[in-house]
């Protein structure tokens, strides 16, 4: 009897320990699991066996726990639904003694969403529970697009959270990306700078509230889209895209290419617009009047150049032809540029007005010389085959060949002509500019400059042009420089001759590039030349004065040189020797001091 009670006590103690371990429950809340509709997902929980595994099961948490599958080491698998257990769950054990209990969910839908419970019954640890929250939703991305307009060399600050209606959870990841021309780069990934591009080196940083700072803004930043990707969970993300538009305020410069009138009575104004972005429009004003395209005697050409720095450089050239005495002798011109700025602002940049005078322009003459690029000489007018579309000029004219012509080259224009109507203005045709057309019209089949000259012409090559001879079919542009010319009639004229113009009826002549002419009738002006009585021209006087001054300067230098030679060759002056120095020897007496009167003598 005593032995029986002993067994009962031992058995009771064992049962108490067993039920105490079973009743002790370890509850572990798992992470949220996100899945797209129609996808497959596996839910896995694991445990490390210490003493004894009683059983494990998967259940879906509803109003009551619906058992999905149950596993017992001795009895095997049991599934609550009429499906094969092998396709729903699997129990595996690794080499390290870890047991994995996996639930397979295939082609899931929103109805399968909810909480799933994994239960391990262990002895003596007790019950270990892990709960997974399965969220089945489609992928959504809340995207917002913004545009920021800014000037160059400014600081740009782009927020990541801008007008966000939903509350941002504490657990999220973000990244900054930049995209241009279809190429996307990563700048930052959750506080880590991962972009080493030279275009952003030293210009980009991350500020508070995950703001992106870009300083200074450059032209290359125009059109770039900076995106902040905020990932709340695998099925929901926010994207804030900001496109940058960059503007630059242009610099305007207006110049007059020729400070003196050329042979055809032209004035050329150049308006140069630098550091332009985006493109701008250049308009011209003459005497306060807005020019709308080409008008009578006025021609405008525009050029565009895209610099390597990204800026645009615009150039507008206005050519004014002084066609007759009816026009004003004075003209004030300036250019104005209208360029867009940030926030629908328009920048109005104007140049300084420039006033020029046409007092030196003479009306067209009856017989006009032909103009070529050869040397200048004296040639009388001919009565036929000459185009009357030239203009006389003052004796201070310079010709510069923009295409780098040498004095021996003959410029020609192809497919161009020039005609005069009523003797007042020029009309260009066949696609060449006004300047080349007027030169082509003033040239004939053979001839040279018919004016005597005091100095040979100076030919300049503009940057980017060759110094070789011009091709026969290439157009030629001319810019006046320094050459002395005058107009002969039946004899050569000096530059100081007085020219008086009169008007007569003479047929207009249309000269084409191939030398053919077409005659139209209209009033043409003729000239009368009066020789001055003194017969001395101002260039001779200037040369004489220069010669006289040079002679005086040479005589002065010669005299100074002779004086220096005389000083160098002259013997040194005699100086008598200095008188000899007398030394007085004073001997002190032995045994006594000097007397007072002797001391006074000394």
Swiss-Prot record:
Q: Where in the cell is it found?
A: Membrane
Q: Which domain of life is it from?
A: Eukaryota
For this UniProt entry, which residues form the secretion signal?
Answer: 1-21
Which UniProt key words apply to this protein?
Cell adhesion, Disulfide bond, Glycoprotein, Immunoglobulin domain, Membrane, Repeat, Signal, Transmembrane, Transmembrane helix
Record keyword Signal present: yes
List residues traversing the bilayer.
Answer: 537-557
Region named Disordered:
402-478
Q: Which GO terms describe its cellular component?
A: cytoplasm; membrane
Quote the biased-composition stretches of kind Low complexity, using this chain's numbering: 434-448
Q: Provide Extracellular-side residue ranges.
A: 22-536
Give residue ranges for domain Ig-like V-type. Answer: 24-134, 138-244
Glycosylation: residue positions = 42, 100, 107, 145, 153, 163, 195-196, 258, 281, 306, 330, 348, 415, 436, 514
Cytoplasmic topological domain: 558-602
Show the ranges annotated as biased composition (Polar residues): 409-433
Entries under Gene3D superfamilies matching the protein: Immunoglobulins
PANTHER family for the chain: T-CELL SURFACE PROTEIN TACTILE
Function field: May be involved in adhesive interactions of activated T and NK cells during the late phase of the immune response. Promotes NK cell-target adhesion by interacting with PVR present on target cells. May function at a time after T and NK cells have penetrated the endothelium using integrins and selectins, when they are actively engaging diseased cells and moving within areas of inflammation.
Put simply, this protein is called T-cell surface protein tactile
């Amino acid at each position: 009897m005593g032995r029986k009670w002993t067994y009962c006590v031992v058995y009771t103690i064992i049962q108490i320990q067993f039920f105490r371990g079973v009743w002790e429950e370890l509850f572990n809340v798992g992470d949220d699991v996100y899945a797209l509709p129609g996808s497959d997902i596996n839910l896995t929980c694991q445990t490390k066996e210490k003493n004894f595994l009683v059983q494990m099961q998967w259940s879906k948490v509803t109003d009551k726990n619906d058992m999905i599958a149950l596993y017992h080491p001795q009895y095997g698998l049991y599934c609550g639904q009429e499906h094969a257990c092998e396709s729903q769950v699997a129990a595996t054990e690794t080499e390290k003694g870890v047991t994995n209990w996996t639930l397979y969910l295939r082609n899931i839908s929103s109805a399968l969403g909810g909480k799933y419970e994994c239960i391990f019954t262990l002895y003596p640890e007790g019950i270990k529970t892990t709960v997974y929250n399965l969220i089945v939703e489609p992928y959504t991305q809340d995207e917002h697009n913004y545009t920021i307009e800014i000037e160059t060399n400014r600081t740009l600050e782009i927020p990541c959270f801008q007008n966000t209606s939903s509350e941002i959870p504490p657990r999220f990841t973000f990244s900054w990306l930049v995209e241009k021309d279809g190429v996307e780069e990563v700048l930052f990934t959750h506080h880590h700078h991962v972009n080493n591009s030279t275009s952003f080196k030293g210009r980009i940083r991350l500020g508070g509230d995950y703001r992106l700072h870009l300083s200074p803004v450059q032209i290359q930043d125009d059109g770039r889209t900076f995106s902040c990707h905020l990932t709340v969970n695998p099925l929901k993300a926010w994207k804030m895209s900001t496109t940058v538009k960059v503007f630059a305020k242009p610099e305007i410069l207006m110049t007059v290419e020729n400070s003196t009138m050329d042979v055809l009575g032209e004035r050329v104004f150049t308006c140069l617009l630098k550091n332009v972005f985006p493109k701008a429009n250049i308009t011209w004003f003459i005497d306060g009047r807005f020019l709308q395209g080409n008008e009578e005697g006025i021609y405008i050409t525009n050029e565009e150049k895209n610099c390597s720095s990204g800026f645009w450089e615009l150039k507008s050239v206005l050519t004014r032809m002084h066609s007759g005495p009816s026009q004003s002798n004075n003209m004030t011109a300036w250019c104005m540029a209208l360029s867009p700025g940030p926030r629908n602002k328009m920048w109005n940049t104007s140049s300084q007005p420039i006033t020029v005078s046409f007092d030196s322009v003479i009306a067209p003459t009856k017989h006009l010389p032909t103009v070529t690029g050869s040397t200048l000489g004296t040639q009388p007018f001919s009565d036929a085959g000459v185009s009357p579309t030239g203009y006389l000029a003052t004796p201070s004219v310079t010709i510069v060949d923009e295409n780098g012509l040498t004095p021996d080259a003959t410029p020609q224009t192809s497919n161009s002509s020039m005609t005069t109507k009523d003797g007042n203005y020029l009309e260009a045709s066949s696609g060449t500019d006004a300047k080349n057309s007027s030169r082509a019209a003033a040239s004939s089949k053979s001839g040279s400059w018919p004016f005597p000259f005091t100095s040979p012409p100076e030919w300049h090559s503009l940057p980017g042009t060759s110094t070789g001879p011009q091709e026969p079919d290439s157009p030629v542009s001319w810019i006046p420089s320094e050459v002395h010319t005058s107009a002969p009639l039946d004899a050569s004229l000096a530059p100081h001759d007085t020219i008086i113009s009169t008007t007569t009826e003479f047929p207009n002549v249309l000269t084409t590039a191939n030398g053919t002419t077409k005659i139209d009738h209209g009033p043409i002006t003729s000239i009368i030349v009066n020789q001055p009585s003194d017969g001395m021209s101002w260039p001779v006087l200037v040369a004489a004065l220069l010669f006289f001054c040079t002679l005086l300067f040479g005589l002065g230098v010669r005299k100074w040189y002779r004086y220096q030679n005389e000083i160098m060759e002259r013997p040194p002056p005699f100086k008598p020797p200095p008188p000899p120095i007398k030394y007085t020897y004073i001997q002190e007496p032995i045994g006594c001091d000097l007397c007072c009167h002797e001391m006074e003598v000394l």
